[in-house]
């Protein structure tokens, strides 16, 4: 069943606009292609305006896990840290749907 890599980022308010532009123009398009994801979506929380969430869709959990532990992902993490270390705190979750109605 479909799986998602969910990346939650808490963004320092002083860099929110730069982060948003970078994610829109560079990171999301590059990640979609490199991750071989089915789709990539992102947005800002309406509960906490400094929380950014990105969703990368995969056909199944195996595909998402393969990406999560790949050299590709390590490279993306390294590049992200070059831009945003100390300004953005993020976490990752893998979720496989167990039910769809």
Regions found by a protein language model. Give the residues of each.
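Macromolecular interaction modules
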Residues: 1-101
């Amino acid at each position: 069943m479909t799986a998602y890599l969910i990346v939650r980022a808490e963004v320092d308010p002083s860099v929110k606009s730069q982060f948003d532009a970078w994610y829109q123009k560079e990171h999301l398009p590059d990640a979609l292609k490199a991750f071989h994801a089915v789709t990539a979506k992102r947005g800002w929380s309406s509960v906490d305006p400094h929380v950014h969430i990105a969703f990368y869709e995969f056909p199944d959990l195996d595909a998402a896990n393969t990406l999560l532990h790949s050299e590709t992902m390590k490279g993306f993490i390294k590049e992200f840290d070059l831009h945003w270390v100390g300004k953005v705190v993020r976490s990752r979750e893998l979720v496989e749907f167990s039910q769809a109605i």
